[in-house]
Amino acid sequence: MFKKVLLGLSLLVLSCVVSAHDVASKPTTVAIYIQAQDYNHQLRLHHYSVGYWYSQGPMLEEAALQVLGQDFKEVAMCDENPASAKVLVWLRPRMSYNPQVQTFYGKVIAYAYTPDGKPLGNFVGKAETHGFLDIKPELHLQAAYHGAMQDVSAKMQADAKFQQALKAAPGASPCATIGLLPEPKVQFMGF
């Protein structure tokens, strides 16, 4: 019995090591970074007695992987620790809600860097979606982030400097430079 358990544990550890190696060695064109505070610090959208608390990070990550994955193919989050990438993109989300016109306003600011930390440019994407705060707000939020990411991606594709960086050789450990990025101020209550 002990040998079977030991064998099972060793196979489990071996499979984890192999899968971690596959993620690290996967070629990446764009590495995406979203700061931890966008995952941990929840924001509140409100209208009189109706309020909705949410984290921006997971919704933005889903939209970024979907949109940038379609446009630039090999895309990975810095959490996956890609071995190399041609461009590092730092995403900063913003969201607001106007209860009088029932509109969600999404904004994503993308700061693009080379793997060695040289800035390539800033791209701002905006989107609006109409919806009520008390009826499935997560769908409207996801639509706003998705629209803003499509706007950002279109601007990246139109930028000559960004396209030049995509043609360059990939740099090693692009996410190692994220410690040098400025720490943003905490966004209080979604203002």
Regions found by a protein language model. Give the residues of each.
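Sec-dependent N-terminal signal peptides
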Residues: K4-L14
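A structural "domain/chain start" motif
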Residues: C16-Q66, F162-F191
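Short secondary-structure boundary motifs at beta->alpha junctions and helix caps
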Residues: H46-S55, D116-A168
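Short, solvent-exposed, polar/charged sequence segments at loop or secondary-structure edges
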Residues: W53-Y97, P184
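Surface-exposed short loop/turn segments
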Residues: C78-I135
